[in-house]
């Protein structure tokens, strides 16, 4: 007779971190939201792809909104109440991700844009001809 093996897997411990930082990386193809503690430890994350979108729909504002809601819900379960938002990238989901974070009940204390802008650096790729 086979014995049941008792599993002692690691469970996610509930932390109580009231203040955090939401990093939004918005590209043309996807939007990734990572919510961290002030020291930089990732508490929750979500992306348009992990929220169930595939292909070109990952780059839409609605996909960014869904990803932001998912990550905010995970962070609020860990006790988060107030966040600073750091945005990077030129994607279409930037504003909708911020609005979704506000709508979930998180208090936004600061919005900072750290999109890298070249001072005439590398030559950009050639224009698409469709």
Curated annotation (Swiss-Prot):
UniProt keyword terms in alphabetical order: Cyanelle, Plastid, Ribonucleoprotein, Ribosomal protein, RNA-binding, rRNA-binding
GO biological process, one term: translation
InterPro entries, per the entry: Ribosomal_uS11 (IPR001971), Ribosomal_uS11_bac-type (IPR019981), Ribosomal_uS11_CS (IPR018102), Ribosomal_uS11_sf (IPR036967)
GO CC terms, sorted: cyanelle; ribonucleoprotein complex; ribosome
Domain of life: Eukaryota
GO terms assigned for molecular function: rRNA binding; structural constituent of ribosome
Protein localization: Plastid, Cyanelle
One Pfam short name: Ribosomal_S11
SUPFAM superfamilies per the UniProt record, alphabetical: Translational machinery components (SSF53137)
PROSITE patterns linked to this entry: RIBOSOMAL_S11
Record's subunit section: Part of the 30S ribosomal subunit.
NCBIfam families xrefs: PRK05309.1, uS11_bact
Family: Belongs to the universal ribosomal protein uS11 family.
Family annotation (HAMAP family): Ribosomal_uS11
Name the record gives this protein: Small ribosomal subunit protein uS11c
Name of encoding gene: rps11
């Amino acid at each position: 007779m086979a014995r049941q093996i008792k599993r002692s897997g690691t469970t996610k411990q509930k932390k109580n971190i009231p203040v955090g930082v939401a990093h939004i990386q918005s590209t043309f193809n996807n939007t990734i939201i990572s919510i961290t503690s002030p020291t930089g430890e990732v508490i929750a994350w979500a992306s348009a792809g992990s929220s169930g979108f595939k292909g070109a729909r990952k780059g839409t504002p609605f996909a960014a909104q869904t990803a932001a809601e998912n990550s905010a819900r995970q962070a609020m379960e860990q006790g988060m109440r107030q966040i600073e938002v750091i945005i990077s990238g030129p994607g279409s989901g930037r504003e909708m991700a911020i609005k979704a974070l506000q709508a979930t009940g998180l208090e936004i204390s600061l919005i900072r844009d750290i999109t890298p802008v070249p001072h005439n650096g590398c030559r950009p790729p050639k224009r698409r001809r469709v």
